[in-house]
Amino acid sequence: MGFSPLISCSAMGALILSCLLLQASNSNAQLRPDFYFRTCPSVFNIIGDIIVDELRTDPRIAASLLRLHFHDCFVRGCDASILLDNSTSFRTEKDAAPNANSARGFGVIDRMKTSLERACPRTVSCADVLTIASQISVLLSGGPWWPVPLGRRDSVEAFFDLANTALPSPFFTLAQLKKAFADVGLNRPSDLVALSGGHTFGRAQCQFVTPRLYNFNGTNRPDPTLDPTYLVQLRALCPQNGNGTVLVNFDVVTPNTFDRQYYTNLRNGKGLIQSDQELFSTPGADTIPLVNLYSSNTFAFFGAFVDAMIRMGNLRPLTGTQGEIRQNCRVVNSRIRGMENDDGVVSSI
């Protein structure tokens, strides 16, 4: 069954053009929303058209692209290090536990980068491709638009070890979540609660859900915060000792739509993973009022989400002469030049 985008495909060109013009009216000291206004004015059209096309056959891709951006930014900043494949110099972040056999959408990013290299050679960084893709993915799924500051450059290395420690776990308590966010500079409760709202669409594997269904914290009992009816439903999808890679919707009501239903689910004991439910079920937590607010006020949620996304997108960006503009998001440019010198062939990478 295909995807019917909440914004029609025919309106995509006009929509992205209007977004680009709006972005041109904004500015930022290091990163600027109008960074590609003259050098690659088609960047939003190219990325947006590819996402629309992918959504027709893969309704998960919007959430997957947003997650890629999140996982990139939490590891040494938004520098596209998550997109690099293994090399002789470093191990890929794709092999890290939070990403292995889980992170997806790399081929879609490749498709975007290939198209952009044809239209605007060596101009748009992979970090900005991923940032723009996450923005448009949210927009096409019913969420807000925001002026994305641009001008990031790409890392020339990956950080496997850091990816294993910096990314929040689905089994984290609220205290652990707060520390993980604060460690990267996102220290406001609204950062944590709003960005967690990215789980309003997409899916998770049973392996990240099963422990709280059968043996929560070694009690041989389910997580007491789970709604009993929801527990029965989840056990049917994720049987004990079953296939851990089976996918379950984060949001049982509107699984492919970016909306405030996620927060209503938390209030009803229907958060899919432990780290989500912790936002509402931790006694006395300062996150509870925010969950209550966002569950009843779309404007408040969207505003907080936009603010948090911009803050996250500004984490330790490489700018100016730092890093590089990768020609291929999977490899650093020096490797491409080496292969050209040795073989005269780049397409095999």
UniProtKB/Swiss-Prot annotation:
Substrate binds at residue 168. The keyword Glycoprotein applies. One of its GO terms (biological process) is response to oxidative stress. CDD domains: secretory_peroxidase. Glycans are attached at residues 86, 217, 243. It is an enzyme of class 1 (oxidoreductase). Ca(2+) 1 binds at residues 72, 75, 77, 79, 81. Its cofactor is Ca(2+); heme b. Its EC number is 1.11.1.7. The active site is at 71 (proton acceptor). The record marks 67 as: Transition state stabilizer. Ca(2+) 2 binds at residues 200, 251, 254, 259. Disulfide bonds join 40-120, 73-78, 126-329, 206-238. Binds 2 calcium ions per subunit. Binds 1 heme b (iron(II)-protoporphyrin IX) group per subunit. One of its GO terms (cellular component) is vacuole. Transmembrane segments: none annotated. One of its GO terms (molecular function) is lactoperoxidase activity. Removal of H(2)O(2), oxidation of toxic reductants, biosynthesis and degradation of lignin, suberization, auxin catabolism, response to environmental stresses such as wounding, pathogen attack and oxidative stress. These functions might be dependent on each isozyme/isoform in each plant tissue. Belongs to the peroxidase family. Classical plant (class III) peroxidase subfamily. This is Peroxidase C3. The lineage of its organism: Eukaryota, Viridiplantae, Streptophyta, Embryophyta, Tracheophyta.
